[in-house]
C-alpha cells in the first residue's frame, strides 16, 4: 500500500467515523443511553476501530493486507450500511398517540421476581458444575485454544447456558439500583467470567460483556463520566490482551509484543479486515440465501432428538472460514454483520439487512422504554434485565452476523421466558400450599421494633 493510497483510505475512514460518531453523540446527549447508542458504538468499534491498527501493522511491520480498493469497499459498505440503518431506526412506523391504559401482558410480584433470578442463576451454576465435572479446568489442560472445539471436550452445549448468570445478577441490581448493587454486579459477574474463562479454556465473552454492562449502567446513573469510560475502555483493551496471551500460551516482549498487541486487539475488537477478505473473494461466493439462519439453529437441537443432525453446521461464519478462506483449523472466523449479509445475498442484502437491524434495535429500545415507564418495579426489573441481558446477542450481531444473532436471541427469549413461567408456576404452588404470606405494615413495624 502506497502512502497516497493510505491517504485516500484515511480520508474515507475519517469521514465515516465522524459521521457515525456525530450522530451517536447527538443521540447520547438526547437520551444518555438507548440501544441505538450502544449499537452505534459497537458498530464503530467493529468496522472502524481496526483501521489505525491495520495501518500501523502495514507500515511498521510490513504486514500484507487486502488491496486498497477492497479496503475502500469495506469502509464504504460499512458507512452506507449505517446510513440506511439510522434512517430506518429514526423512521416512525405509526403515529404517536396518547398513552391509553391497557391490560398488561404479564405482571410480576416480589416472590416471582426473586424466583426468576434464582432460577436463571441456578441454570448457569448447574451448567458450569456439570461442564467442570466432565472436563476440569481446560485452560490448564489443553495445549491450544482450538482444542476447546474438538471431540476431547464433552458437554459443549452446556456453554450456552453459562451466560444466564448475567441476567440473573441484572435482576438483583435493578431491584435496588444503588451503587452497592452496581459494584456487586461487577464483582459477581466478573468473578463468574474468570471462573468460566479457566473452565472453558479461554473464552472471554462473559468478562467483556459484564464489564460493558457495568460501564453503561454507570453512565446511565451518572456514577462515571465519559473520561472515566474512556480510561476503563483502555484498561479493558489491555486486560483482554493479557487474557488472550494466556489463552494462546504466548510469551512475547519488545517489538514482538507490540506486534502481537496490535493484531490481537484488532481481531478481538475490530475484525473489519475479515469483511475485506470476503469482498476480495466476492466472485467465488455461492450465495446461501436465508439458509445460514436456519442452519444456525441446528446446534440447539440435541443429537438424541435428531440422530441425523449434521455434525458441521454451515452458517455464514463456517462458510466464510471453510469455503472462502479454505481454513480448516477448527476455529470459525467471524465474517462480521455485513459479511454475513454478503454471504447470504451479496451486495443487495446489505441495505436490506440494515433495514432489518434498524427494526431490531428499535424493538429493543421500545422494550427498554416500556421498562422505564413501568410503575411495578418488579416487572421493570425483569424488562430491564431482559434488555441488558440481550447485549451479548447484539455483540454477536455485529461480530458474527445476522444468522448467529437470530438463533441466539431466539434461544435467549425461550430460556428467559421459560424461567419466568416456572417462577410463576412455583409461586402459584407455594401460594396454594399456604407458604406465602403477604407483607403488611403492622408485621413490618413489629419486625423493626423487635
UniProtKB/Swiss-Prot annotation:
Annotated pathway: Bacterial outer membrane biogenesis; enterobacterial common antigen biosynthesis
Topological category with respect to the lipid bilayer: Multi-pass membrane protein
GO process terms (BP): enterobacterial common antigen biosynthetic process
Keyword Membrane part of the UniProt annotation: yes
Location, primary (coarse class): membrane
GO cellular component: plasma membrane
Cited InterPro entries: WzyE
Subcellular location: Cell inner membrane
Transmembrane stretches, start-end: 6-26, 37-57, 63-83, 118-138, 155-175, 181-201, 207-227, 228-248, 341-361, 378-398, 410-430
Swiss-Prot/TrEMBL keywords: Cell inner membrane, Cell membrane, Membrane, Transmembrane, Transmembrane helix
Keyword Protein transport: no
Family: Belongs to the WzyE family.
Subunit and interaction comment: Probably part of a complex composed of WzxE, WzyE and WzzE.
NCBIfam families associated with the record: PRK02975.1 (NF002820)
Function summary: Probably involved in the polymerization of enterobacterial common antigen (ECA) trisaccharide repeat units.
Protein name: Probable ECA polymerase
Species the sequence originates in: Escherichia coli O7:K1 (strain IAI39 / ExPEC)
Amino acid at each position: 500500500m502506497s502512502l497516497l493510497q493510505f491517504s485516500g483510505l484515511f480520508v474515507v475512514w475519517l469521514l465515516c467515523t465522524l459521521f457515525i460518531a456525530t450522530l451517536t453523540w447527538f443521540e447520547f446527549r438526547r437520551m444518555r443511553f438507548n440501544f441505538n447508542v450502544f449499537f452505534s458504538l459497537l458498530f464503530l468499534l467493529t468496522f472502524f476501530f481496526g483501521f489505525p491498527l491495520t495501518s500501523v501493522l502495514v507500515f511498521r511491520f510490513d504486514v500484507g493486507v487486502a488491496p486498497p480498493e477492497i479496503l475502500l469497499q469495506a469502509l464504504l459498505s460499512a458507512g452506507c450500511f449505517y446510513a440506511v440503518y439510522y434512517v430506518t431506526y429514526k423512521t416512525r412506523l405509526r403515529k404517536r398517540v396518547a398513552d391509553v391504559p391497557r391490560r398488561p401482558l404479564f405482571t410480576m410480584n416480589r416472590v416471582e421476581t426473586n424466583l426468576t433470578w434464582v432460577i436463571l442463576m441456578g441454570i448457569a451454576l448447574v451448567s458450569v458444575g456439570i461442564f467442570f465435572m466432565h472436563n476440569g479446568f481446560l485452560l490448564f489442560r489443553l495445549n491450544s485454544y482450538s482444542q476447546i472445539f474438538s471431540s476431547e471436550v464433552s458437554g459443549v452445549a452446556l456453554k450456552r447456558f453459562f451466560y444466564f448468570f448475567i441476567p440473573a445478577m441484572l435482576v438483583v441490581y435493578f431491584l435496588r439500583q444503588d451503587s452497592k448493587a452496581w459494584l456487586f454486579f461487577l464483582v459477581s459477574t466478573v468473578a463468574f467470567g474468570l471462573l468460566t474463562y479457566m473452565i472453558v479454556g479461554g473464552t472471554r465473552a462473559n468478562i467483556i460483556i459484564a464489564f460493558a454492562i457495568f460501564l453503561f449502567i454507570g453512565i446511565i446513573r451518572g456514577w462515571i463520566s465519559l473520561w472515566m469510560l474512556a480510561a476503563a475502555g483502555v484498561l479493558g483493551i489491555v486486560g483482554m490482551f493479557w487474557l488472550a496471551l494466556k489463552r494462546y500460551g504466548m510469551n512475547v516482549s519488545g517489538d514482538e509484543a507490540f506486534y502481537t498487541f496490535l493484531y490481537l486487539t484488532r481481531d478481538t475488537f475490530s475484525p473489519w479486515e475479515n469483511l475485506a477478505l470476503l469482498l476480495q473473494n466476492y466472485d467465488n461466493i455461492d450465495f446461501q440465501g436465508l439458509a445460514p439462519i436456519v442452519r444456525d439453529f441446528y446446534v440447539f437441537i440435541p443429537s438424541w432428538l435428531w440422530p441425523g443432525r449434521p455434525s458441521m453446521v454451515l452458517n455464514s461464519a463456517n462458510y466464510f472460514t471453510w469455503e472462502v478462506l479454505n481454513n480448516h483449523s477448527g476455529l470459525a472466523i467471524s465474517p462480521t454483520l455485513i459479511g454475513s449479509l454478503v454471504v447470504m445475498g451479496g451486495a443487495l442484502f446489505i441495505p436490506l439487512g440494515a433495514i432489518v437491524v434498524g427494526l431490531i434495535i428499535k424493538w429493543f429500545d421500545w422494550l427498554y422504554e416500556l421498562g422505564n415507564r413501568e410503575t411495578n418495579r418488579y416487572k421493570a426489573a425483569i424488562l430491564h434485565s431482559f434488555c441488558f441481558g440481550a447485549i451479548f446477542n447484539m455483540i454477536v450481531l455485529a461480530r458474527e452476523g445476522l444468522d448467529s444473532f437470530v438463533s441466539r436471541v431466539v434461544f435467549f427469549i425461550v430460556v428467559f421466558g421459560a424461567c419466568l413461567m416456572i417462577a410463576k408456576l412455583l409461586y402459584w404452588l407455594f401460594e396454594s400450599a399456604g407458604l406465602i404470606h403477604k407483607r403488611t405494615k403492622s408485621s413490618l413495624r413489629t419486625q423493626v421494633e423487635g
